[in-house]
Amino acid sequence: MCSKRELRMLMLHYSKHGECILQEIGAAFRGEHATDLLLICDGKETVRAHKLVLAAASPLIRMILEETPVLDGVTTVYFPEVQVSYFRLLLDFLYSGQVYVRSVEEYHHLQDLLALLQIKASIWKNSDGSGEGEPRKSEPLVDINRNTEGITGSSVVHQHPSRRRRSKSQDSLSGDSASGGGGTGSQAGTPKKVSVKSERHSAGSSVDGDGDRDREENLEYLDEVEEAIIKSNNNHPLHPHQHHLVAGSGGHHHHHHHHHHHRQLHQIKTRSRRSDPSANRRRSSSDPVNLSIVKQQQDVDSDDANIDVETIGTATTKTLLPPRYLDPFRTKRKAAAYYIHPADAEALKPMDHEGLLHNSPDNYVVTPHRKRRPGFHNSPAQNPPFVPSYLDDLRARSKCFLSAPPTYLPELRPGSPTSVRHAEIAAGLSNNNNSSSNNNNNNNRIRPPSADNKLAVAPFVYPWPTAALAGLPGGPSDLLGLPYVHGGGPNAETSPADLLQQMKNFENSQAELSARASAAGGGGGGSGGNGSGSGGVASGGGGGSMGGNTAVREYRCEYCGKTFGMSWNLKTHLRVHTGEKPFACRLCVAMFKQKAHLLKHLCSVHRNIINAPEAGGRYTCCFCSLVFETLQELVRHLSGHHNNLLLSKNLHE
């Protein structure tokens, strides 16, 4: 800081003001601090930037920000057909003042992006305006790096109205070094990078002879550099391609035609006499193209707030947006960006298929498993009661009906010698022998229909609903086990009263069979009784292979439909669904569904207690002082004498 007193006032001069501002802006861009502009490119890739920086360079961004109300401080602009890599190059160029492009294709895309954002060509093109004021003290560094991949030549040709020199023999330039007004040259044969220093003077109000002489020397020097590069790269094929840069002096604009060789890098640096020596530093790159911002001298009548839109010379402009996006913003040059404000952050995120799953604990259904962790209780609400299906009973008891439908039964054909009368079937149902209930009996076996006899069609019988069948005595399983009986011919009709009488007769016969089987088995229980409380249902039926008078009882689980032959097996199984754990370990308060699991737990987990080293290999009861020689004796002792201590309901006693 330095202070100066002038007209009784103090002026503070911030000598490094611009440098500090640029450093802060660069740090904010690299760290994405205080970003208020979100750019969404192709593939939903995002880039964050600052409105102030982009609005200062792009009239399109400034117009978007002026027309869009700011709600949350962040504005989102969509560029659906612009790759994010090109936008990063543009941001590096706007924030740092220069950018290195590695291919000609990227350079062209960057040019198109500059044109899309309506960025003036004077910002990045080297042009000198003629001013009427005093000469400028210093001018910044201007780097024009040309990538030669796909472009013929890397030289710069200045077309001057009065003079143009390109007559140098290649033989004379093979050993000479090119030198110019700045006293610095580059050899023609060896280097791939040619650095040129030239001295420029700002044009004043009048053009003198010294300025013309210096300009002519610069043109001659550039011609020598061009021919030196052509000499050093004469083996590379040429591809005609031109780029136009706007340059002028004394109010005239001259077009410079650039011819580039394949895979040849050429850099021309133009510096002023009073430029800072620190500006000599350059960043190295394998194949760069460098664009640098040039400070333009503003005209007196120019208005900074009104910036005209200019195109970039004759460079090829590719259509980056579809025509439907060009309607909202139509200026001197048609270019626009589809934007939405404010941004919907949820719409930008990709579809998350895993997020569709509800992770609520209520949606986790625990399947029955015999091995559970100690203390785990399964909620009965998560296990709906099992709804039994009587189709299995129908298949088991009426296998003969599966071979042919009732309309194809030989008993229904009139005049058949093997037909069975209704009276005989009723007598067979009331008979006490077991052969009437056996489906495999040869006397009642139904044979398949023959081809010589005509098929008889049985009359339609109204199907009984499930609720009506369940309300009838005897249970639905017995009704489904009732075989189809028809007493008349094929044209006879059966009344509901006859069907009810047949059902009652079948029910009485089944009751007599069950009573006789229970009496023979020593009071094994009645048919259809409750076998396990509310969790299981016990049912009885005739046993074909169990003997003459032995009834087979089965206990069905209402939750999963499993059947068991003994009630205690069903009772133990129901603990899987209800989560009941009636057995508990007093040593570690672990709970179990079965006593066998608790005894196994005591003999394995607490083996150091029941089989202590000081016991001499014998087993000690953990509840009393008795000692046993074998583990089986200890288990028998725990299960018998200390059975109450194994129950969880007596855990607190």
From Swiss-Prot:
GO terms for cellular component: nucleus. The keyword Transcription applies. GO terms for biological process: female analia development; female genitalia development; male analia development; male genitalia development; regulation of DNA-templated transcription; regulation of transcription by RNA polymerase II. It is found in: Nucleus. GO terms for molecular function: DNA binding; DNA-binding transcription factor activity; RNA polymerase II cis-regulatory region sequence-specific DNA binding; zinc ion binding. Residues 126-215, 234-305, 429-451, 512-534 are annotated as: Disordered. Transcription factor required for terminalia development. Negative regulator of the JAK/STAT pathway: represses JAK/STAT-dependent expression of ventral veins lacking (vvl) in the posterior spiracles. This is Transcription factor Ken 1. It comes from Culex quinquefasciatus.
